[in-house]
């Protein structure tokens, strides 16, 4: 008699692989958001409690939308990417009041030098 059950070792390994991927993604999101907050504070003296952050991933990378408390209808969009030296770089895309502008790479402005 042969059993048609999958091996528990395979299921555990698969679950650990998925869990590792999710934890890596959450760690990257946290690290990049922290870097964005520090960059905005250091370069523009903007405190973290002045805005709300929304996160998404698209074909260009990690996108963060900032909504300031005093500008509810405007979203500011930033990408946090890595340069060839594996350092984080904050790239400002722009702002829109409708929330659905097309992304074009040539409109990006890098906030921190060295990229």
Q: PLM features: what roles do these ranges have?
A:
Residues 1-7:
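Short, Lys/Arg-rich N-terminal segment immediately upstream of the first membrane anchor
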Residues 4, 36-44, 74-76, 81-83:
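Structured catalytic/translocation cores of nucleotide/phosphate-coupled proteins
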Residues 8-25:
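Hydrophobic membrane-insertion alpha-helices, especially the h-region
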Residues 24-52:
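Short, non-transmembrane alpha-helical segments in secretory-pathway proteins
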Residues 44-73:
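Short extracytoplasmic
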Residues 76-115:
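Structured, soluble extracytoplasmic/luminal domains of envelope-associated proteins
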